[in-house]
């Protein structure tokens, strides 16, 4: 299998890259769209970025919001017609709590658009699991607690929920199909000492990969690093040992546990990635990324409440330049490293391109 986590995927879409600057006047469809169909989730994770008081992310999120069925079906039609390559369903809430998810992915399964989802795994069962197993490209399940008791404490759920999620993953793999099932472990001070055994337990369930990431506790990079400093060395050692002992051609361990930049300041004044991977929220608003979702003051680029996604997208190139990252994105940004690569590519001197 090729590289799953690489910042260079966008460079396979040269025409899209070259269309990004304002002065081209050209609007092409996004390559990938992240859709947040509902803000409902039955779990209450303490570190959830959309609920944390100390993070700008999700500050205007309303739990009751969801995308109406008719609007979702209209949007899927637009996505197919526009030539969008992929859709990821995520939160906000948990997409598997969206009442029309099954109908939505059934519709997508009859098209060329690839789809995936992020979920807590509690509802990964029944027909919707079969559709994802047979037609989805990947699923990633977020986990923190390492057993029934700890999982219950993390998420405010019953002490049976952890076993249920683990069984759902095991049963999902038994369906067959080509959907790549991964787990995302969000590391904090509570589970840091249990990572090695936890990764072994996850492998034994039969999933394809596990990703290790730090919880984000603040808009300030220094504060994030200060939180992780007491556990940092131990976590790195456990993950290294797990990779040596458990990783093979059937089980990938992707280590994304690292210190964050001390400063989140951005030195560029427009965001290329909002034209590549925009976010559609459950409130029917369009945002540049998941880090700016549900931030109406600084992250809103448009709405499909009274128009279709296609009509909004092609209405004006100016919509994509409303946000100045150097002024309003001085916080954690999932697209920052990708943006810098794209901008470096676009800013290369044309007279000197041959001098590789």
Model-predicted segments: where are they?
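Radical SAM enzyme [4Fe-4S]-AdoMet core and its adjacent flexible, acidic
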Residues: 2, 36, 58-60, 67, ...
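Residue-level signal for mature regions of secreted extracellular proteins and peptides
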Residues: 34, 38-41, 264, 282, ...
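Short cysteine clusters
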Residues: 41, 45-48, 271, 289, ...
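Short, flexible helix/strand-to-coil boundary loops that buttress conserved ligand/catalytic motifs
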Residues: 49-52, 128, 154-155, 290, ...
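Secreted/processed peptides and extracellular or luminal domains of membrane proteins
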Residues: 47, 51-54, 233, 277, ...
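Flexible mid-to-C-terminal extensions adjoining Fe-S/redox cofactors in radical SAM and related proteins
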Residues: 3-29, 266, 285-286, 290-356
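Conserved alpha-helical substructure of the radical SAM core
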Residues: 2-138, 229, 234-235, 354-356
């Amino acid at each position: 299998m090729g590289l799953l986590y690489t910042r260079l995927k966008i460079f396979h879409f040269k025409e899209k890259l070259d269309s990004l600057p304002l002065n081209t006047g050209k609007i092409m469809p996004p390559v990938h769209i992240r859709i947040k169909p509902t803000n409902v989730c039955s779990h209450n994770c303490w570190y959830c970025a959309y609920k944390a008081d100390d993070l700008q992310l999700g500050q205007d999120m309303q739990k009751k919001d969801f995308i109406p069925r008719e609007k979702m079906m209209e949007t899927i039609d637009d996505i197919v017609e526009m030539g969008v390559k992929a859709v990821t369903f995520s939160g906000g809430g948990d997409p598997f709590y969206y009442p029309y998810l099954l109908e939505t992915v059934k519709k997508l399964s009859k098209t060329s658009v690839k789809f995936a989802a992020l979920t807590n795994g509690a509802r990964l069962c029944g027909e919707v699991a079969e559709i994802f197993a047979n037609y989805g490209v990947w699923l990633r399940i977020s986990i923190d607690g390492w057993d029934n008791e700890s999982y219950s404490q993390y998420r405010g759920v019953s002490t049976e929920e952890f076993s249920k999620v683990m069984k759902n993953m095991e049963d999902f793999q038994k369906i067959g199909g080509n959907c790549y099932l991964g787990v995302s472990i969000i590391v904090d001070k509570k589970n840091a000492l249990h990572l090695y055994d936890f990764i072994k337990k996850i492998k034994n369930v039969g999933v394809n990969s596990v990703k290790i990431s730090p919880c984000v506790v603040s808009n300030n990079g220094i504060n994030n690093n200060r939180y992780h400093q007491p556990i940092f060395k131990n976590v790195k050692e456990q993950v290294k040992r797990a990779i040596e002992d458990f990783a093979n051609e059937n089980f990938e361990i992707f280590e994304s546990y690292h210190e964050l930049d001390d400063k989140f300041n951005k030195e560029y004044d427009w965001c290329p990635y909002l034209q590549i991977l925009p976010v559609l929220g459950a409130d029917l608003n369009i945002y540049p990324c998941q880090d700016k979702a549900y931030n109406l003051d600084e992250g809103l680029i448009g709405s499909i409440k009274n128009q279709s996604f296609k009509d909004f997208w092609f209405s004006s190139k100016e919509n994509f330049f409303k946000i100045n990252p150097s002024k309003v994105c001085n916080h954690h940004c999932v697209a920052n490293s990708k943006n810098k690569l794209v901008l470096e590519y676009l800013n290369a001197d044309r007279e000197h391109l041959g001098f590789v």
